Amino acid sequence: MKQKIHLWIEEYLFFPKFFQKIISFLLLPLTLIYLIIIFTKRFKAKKIDFDIPIISIGNIIVGGSGKTPITIELASKYENACVILRGYGRSSKGLQIVSLNGDIKVDVTVSGDEAMLLAKSLKKATIIVSENRIEAILKAKELGSKIIFLDDGFSKYSISKFDILLKPKNEPTNNFCLPSGGYREPKSFYKKANIVLQEGKDFKRVITIKKDENIKELPSYTILLTAISKPKRLLEFLPKNIKMISFPDHHNFTKEEILDIQNEYKDYAILTTGKDMVKLKEFNLENLYLMDLSIKIDENVDFSSMNSYINSFK
């Protein structure tokens, strides 16, 4: 039931059917209030310069658009890099140092799934989770970081930064902002970014199936188990006979849920994403496969403005 509700909300926000469009229009007065709040915050914000290059990687629609793999791809190119994110789905509060120069300090319950995936992928970087991005930036500088990558930082108007916005390959047919649609900020705000990268044009996802770090072929009977935003986007990379079991974004799997899935799909292998794998490892599942996602950025993408921004701090 939860899975059906989750998928219905996703459909309503991005690709609504007739009845869902009616709901969308009925909620427009609330959307207007939401927009007034957004514009007021942006107008009142006073930029703070932290004297360190800060690259924000974000999007203006609800849910995932490849921020984590793009962050990994870009941050891996720099020494003394720090990635700062809120840490959705974690049990902890406040600022937590997830990894320090590649040395992982906490477990996934403290860090959240995205932060742990970043920590495991960026072997020399520092990863910090915090609700307060300004506090985290100051901590990163204190720890000796020379460049900061800010996850989902576009709406942090008070931070002076270089903004990269990601566009989905298939843009929503519903162009309204919340709660009438899936945009967190007006679509026109793409023009306010320093660089806009669109999936399918400027970058593409590369999928590799692995088991125990080795490249493998998927068994004939496989289910996709995931707790990411917009899970249907994964299906285009997989055989059509794959069944999908999805949970809300950042969901923490329980032992009971895993046992129920194993009982229902006794002869099936389980395929999952890197973000989910950091949470599923604790269950020691024998027939667990990884849908390893990496990003290939088109060689024609122009990063000269970002390089100039970074060099201006040297």
Curated annotation (Swiss-Prot):
<keyword id="KW-0547">Nucleotide-binding</keyword>
<keyword id="KW-0441">Lipid A biosynthesis</keyword>
<keyword id="KW-0444">Lipid biosynthesis</keyword>
<dbReference type="GO" id="GO:0009029">
    <property type="term" value="F:tetraacyldisaccharide 4'-kinase activity"/>
</dbReference>
<keyword id="KW-0067">ATP-binding</keyword>
<protein>
    <recommendedName>
        <fullName>Tetraacyldisaccharide 4'-kinase</fullName>
        <ecNumber>2.7.1.130</ecNumber>
    </recommendedName>
</protein>
<dbReference type="GO" id="GO:0009245">
    <property type="term" value="P:lipid A biosynthetic process"/>
</dbReference>
<dbReference type="Pfam" id="PF02606">
    <property type="entry name" value="LpxK"/>
</dbReference>
<dbReference type="GO" id="GO:0009244">
    <property type="term" value="P:lipopolysaccharide core region biosynthetic process"/>
</dbReference>
<dbReference type="InterPro" id="IPR003758">
    <property type="entry name" value="LpxK"/>
</dbReference>
<keyword id="KW-0418">Kinase</keyword>
<feature type="binding site">
    <location>
        <begin position="61"/>
        <end position="68"/>
    </location>
    <ligand>
        <name>ATP</name>
    </ligand>
</feature>
<comment type="similarity">
    <text>Belongs to the LpxK family.</text>
</comment>
<comment type="function">
    <text>Transfers the gamma-phosphate of ATP to the 4'-position of a tetraacyldisaccharide 1-phosphate intermediate (termed DS-1-P) to form tetraacyldisaccharide 1,4'-bis-phosphate (lipid IVA).</text>
</comment>
<dbReference type="GO" id="GO:0005886">
    <property type="term" value="C:plasma membrane"/>
</dbReference>
<dbReference type="GO" id="GO:0005524">
    <property type="term" value="F:ATP binding"/>
</dbReference>
<comment type="pathway">
    <text>Glycolipid biosynthesis; lipid IV(A) biosynthesis; lipid IV(A) from (3R)-3-hydroxytetradecanoyl-[acyl-carrier-protein] and UDP-N-acetyl-alpha-D-glucosamine: step 6/6.</text>
</comment>
<keyword id="KW-0808">Transferase</keyword>
<keyword id="KW-0443">Lipid metabolism</keyword>
